[in-house]
């Protein structure tokens, strides 16, 4: 039996909606982790990394840096932000087992809100290289 390919735009839309709902109801850990998954998916798609390929977020950042260098882009835009974003995710996961969900969730509000903002800015930035990126389900708030 042949496995069908999932509609990636529906998955992205579902995760995007779940992140927004988590943020609205104060589930900041969940919102942060969902945004992390969305940014990972965005990088994988943008860099044409096959879905089944096992690659770390850190390696995705390195591949993104290489892409910018290939494009002769002089400024490593979003490299530091993505690195700090991933490091914060790792700290957040460690905090869950060290200090528990309630404490970690309270401490994650600002980070979750910034993650959502960075996600939108990153989509807008990548769209300058690939205008089709939003057709894949990734969207940002353009104020409309």
Feature-to-residue mapping (PLM):
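A short, mixed-charge helix-start or loop-turn motif at secondary-structure junctions
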Residues: 1-2, 71
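Short, charged amphipathic alpha-helical segments flanked by flexible coils
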Residues: 47-78, 83
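Amphipathic alpha-helical interaction surfaces
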Residues: 41-48, 67-70, 88-91, 95-98
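Residues at structural and domain junctions
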Residues: 5, 17, 21-25, 68, ...
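Sequence-level detector for tyrosine residue identity
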Residues: 32, 64-67, 73, 119, ...
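Amphipathic alpha-helical interface elements
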Residues: 2-62, 132-136
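Charge-enriched, short contiguous segments at helix-coil
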Residues: 75-144
């Amino acid at each position: 039996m042949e496995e069908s390919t999932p509609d990636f735009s529906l998955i992205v839309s579902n995760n995007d909606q779940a992140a927004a709902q988590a943020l609205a109801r104060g589930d900041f850990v969940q919102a942060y982790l969902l945004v992390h998954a969305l940014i990972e998916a965005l990088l994988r798609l943008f860099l044409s990394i096959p879905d089944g390929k096992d690659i770390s977020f850190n390696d995705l950042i390195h591949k993104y840096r290489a892409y910018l260098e290939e494009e002769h882009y002089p400024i490593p835009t979003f490299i530091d932000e993505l690195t700090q974003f991933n490091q914060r995710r790792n700290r957040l996961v460690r905090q869950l087992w060290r200090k528990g969900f309630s404490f970690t969730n309270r401490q994650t509000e600002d980070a979750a809100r910034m993650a959502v903002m960075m996600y939108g800015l990153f989509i807008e930035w990548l769209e300058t290289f690939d205008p089709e990126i939003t057709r894949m389900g990734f969207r940002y708030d353009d104020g409309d």
